[in-house]
Amino acid sequence: MKPSVILYKTLPDDLLQRLEEHFSVTQVKNLRPETVSQHAEAFAQAEGLLGSSEKVDAALLEKMPKLRATSTVSVGYDNFDVEALNARRVLLMHTPTVLTETVADTVMALVLSTARRVVEVAERVKAGEWTKSIGPDWFGTDVHHKTLGIVGMGRIGMALAQRAHFGFGMPILYNARRQHPQAEERFNARYCDLDTLLQEADFVCLILPLSEETHHLFGQAQFAKMKSSAIFINAGRGPVVDEQALIAALQNGEIHAAGLDVFEHEPLAKDSPLLSLPNVVALPHIGSATHETRYNMAACAVDNLIDALNGNVEKNCVNPQVK
């Protein structure tokens, strides 16, 4: 008999077929309590769980006593209670490699669109405001040869540094838990403490996962240390930034502008002050959102679940020690 799994995300037909070749699949819309109650027997029998964006906590795990592995269609896993998974010896698989280049493209797009005011001036053109030769009130700021500060030199940070160094001639500063010799050799990147990076960088790009250590890592004190001409980019996780402090820094002119793909609370509230600021480019968490990459992420997640339930945790496993 095939192992039973719960699928809480729509998959392309070929990937669903692949999943069904290995497992008995129950598809549900979400992991809300009412859904779990409606499919109580399927959840009780499931050995695997696959999807994205939903909260997986101790209360859900109580309903899934046979669960052995869960596979998320994402690199981030802050919506999972990892301690609860570890306590029950449930493997957590993720997709850390397939989205690197696409997310780096998005970060670079935020750098360019924020510096050159692309969204703002495009809207002015659509509104019929381009009636004569443009003046300084339409101008942006250069990107090439400006100093880029990267906070978090992981895979995405490295891909961003490659684009910035070779494509735009940007000097690279970076801050991370440890030095990255490859970044220093390939991109002439300079490791420095966070305060130095904030004081010297023209663009501060935050590419960090959310953890107890990084929650509200950026607040009033950090924005106060940045240049008034600096542009802040967040493409990691929203709660790494104290959003109220960011709003105040933008409103008070402590920093020049911000390009944001993530927010403390998502979706972003319609009445958020960020949406009324002309010096903010706000995206709906589209870092990896291309047809190609989202397909590859889903395919990776399917393969990860197959591997995990067959005892193979050599790659893409957050907690291999519980095997």
From Swiss-Prot:
The keyword Methyltransferase is assigned to this record: no
GO CC term, one of those recorded: cytosol
Transmembrane segments: none
EC number(s) on file: 1.1.1.79, 1.1.1.81
Keyword Cytoplasm (UniProt): yes
Top-level class of the enzyme under EC nomenclature: oxidoreductase
Alphabetized InterPro entries for the sequence: D-isomer_2-hydroxyacid_DH, D-isomer_2_OHA_DH_cat_dom, D-isomer_DH_CS, D-isomer_DH_NAD-bd, Glyo/OHPyrv_Rdtase_B, NAD(P)-bd_dom_sf
Gene Ontology MF term list: glyoxylate reductase (NADPH) activity; hydroxypyruvate reductase (NADH) activity; hydroxypyruvate reductase (NADPH) activity; NAD binding
SUPFAM superfamilies xrefs: Formate/glycerate dehydrogenase catalytic domain-like, NAD(P)-binding Rossmann-fold domains
Organism domain of life: Bacteria
Compartments where located: Cytoplasm
Any Pfam family: 2-Hacid_dh_C
Disulfide bond positions: none
PROSITE patterns on file: D_2_HYDROXYACID_DH_2, D_2_HYDROXYACID_DH_3
Protein purpose: Catalyzes the NADPH-dependent reduction of glyoxylate and hydroxypyruvate into glycolate and glycerate, respectively.
Family per record: Belongs to the D-isomer specific 2-hydroxyacid dehydrogenase family. GhrB subfamily.
NCBIfam families, alphabetized: PRK15409.1 (NF011938)
Complex formation: Homodimer.
Protein name per Swiss-Prot or TrEMBL: Glyoxylate/hydroxypyruvate reductase B
Gene source species: Klebsiella pneumoniae subsp. pneumoniae (strain ATCC 700721 / MGH 78578)
